[in-house]
Amino acid sequence: MSVYQQRAAELARLRREAIEEAHVGQGLTYTEIATALGITKGRVTQIRGGAPARERAFFGVGPVHVGVPLREGTDDRMRSYIDAADLATQTDTETLFGTLALAAEPFTIPSDTSTVPDGDVVVICGPKSAPIGADLMESDPCLGMVREHGRWWIIDKRTGELFGSPSTNDPPEPADVGYLSRRRDGDRVIVHVAGIRSTGSRGVLHYLARHLRELYLRTGDESFSLAIRCELDDLTVTDSSIVSGPHLW
């Protein structure tokens, strides 16, 4: 049933976007739009107020799989676990989806995972956590991650510019850097999130929760990547901003 509900929500979003395009792009009044569509102005108001926002399409149609790494323990029993910051990022993603009428389907990413699940997906995973993270970054023509000088960096593949986590500076600063890409893959969307540390991933979601609409208006349905710096109070993100991008592919 979730699939059908998500399709219905997407159809409502498309109706709302078409109405707004006619109003803003063509200069029609809502009364004129209602007349052209053969519906009442009240129905137009209902569509505008009740349908999901246009930026819902950033993540696809839904339901959306939301994956985080399953890490290997280092104690005697070698139990697998999910990092607290990764779990918080997964929860932040689900919270954001709640504002967009998107259904989330959480999953874990074992360390040997190389295949992206079918359908719309948010992969919260760095290149060192699983092959799926490394492969997605490898296919990004603009940004990636490299290990140099004993630490990890986000790299602009075209210029060689490096963006490191302030938390690994000497002295360390309460901040981190995260990576975000969004790509159209046939009839689905793959969003990839990765931090230099796991807190960097949460910084990406902090930014999306506050700037998704403006980012979607800038990038539309194009594939792109960007880097985000976030300020931290322990594991809590207090601010976030773009430091590179968005770079359209």
PLM features: residue spans?
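Solvent-exposed alpha-helical segments and adjacent loops
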Residues: 31, 52-249
